Amino acid sequence: MTEFSPDAAALRAALAALGPGRVWRPVHGPDGTLLAPGRGPGPECLDAYVAGLDVAGKTVADLGCNLGYFAFLAARNGACRVLGCDSDPEVAAAANLLARVHGVSNVAFTALDFLAAPAPERFDLALFVDFVGRGVVAKGRLAAVAAAAEAWARREAFFTLHPVYALEALAVPPDVLAARHPNCVRDGRFFVAEALAGLLGPEWSMRRLTDGRLDTGDASLRTKTALLFTRNT
């Protein structure tokens, strides 16, 4: 990365201001320099998340994008245009700096709470990478996620998530969970993928792209599943 570029200097300053707690995934400069390590697995694991996903020629929304690892990956894999959304304005600003430093013109970022704000348009594909987790389930936000998928995705919605949680892993009483998602609490477990499919309804078909697991070599990710929902009409 050219050290004398004003955008490069601004990006380094922005990443330093964010600190490691707000950078979820590795950030690299155009020359491959690691600018921020992120908190999770490396590229070899992350790229496996979307290995079975066809983005070529599609418009893509990366919702809950952080610094846009999957937004940039979608562009490299042939997406024609990508919009990344993150609720943190400083993160979105840093992601836009990153796009400029890389010279990527078909990826942009905006600060937006996509669970509350209306979608500016519908995209061919909406990505929800690692967005649905214990917090979303416990706070009763799964229905809002399904509504966001309906609003943002014209044709497809992609999720990576744990399809099943043990009830003791969730900070919500089982009866509350059962009231929210009938028939999805049984045998001491909550079936997240089933609940999401039920919320999206019969207009969508669900396909597991990873046959029930993300086999990335990282043991912490092996219970995650990549799901693709496709509109039937």
Language model segments and positions:
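Conserved SAM-binding strand-loop segment of SAM-dependent methyltransferases
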Residues: 103-114
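Conserved SAM-binding loop
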Residues: 95-96
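Conserved beta-strand signature within the Rossmann-like core of class I S-adenosyl-L-methionine
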Residues: 153-163
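Conserved alpha-helix/loop element of class I SAM-dependent methyltransferases that forms part
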Residues: 39-55
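A conserved beta-strand element that flanks and buttresses the S-adenosyl-L-methionine
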Residues: 127
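Glycine-rich SAM-binding Motif I of class I
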Residues: 68-72
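Conserved SAM-binding motif I beta-strand of class I
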Residues: 81-86
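A short, conserved alpha-helix within the catalytic core of class I
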Residues: 135-148
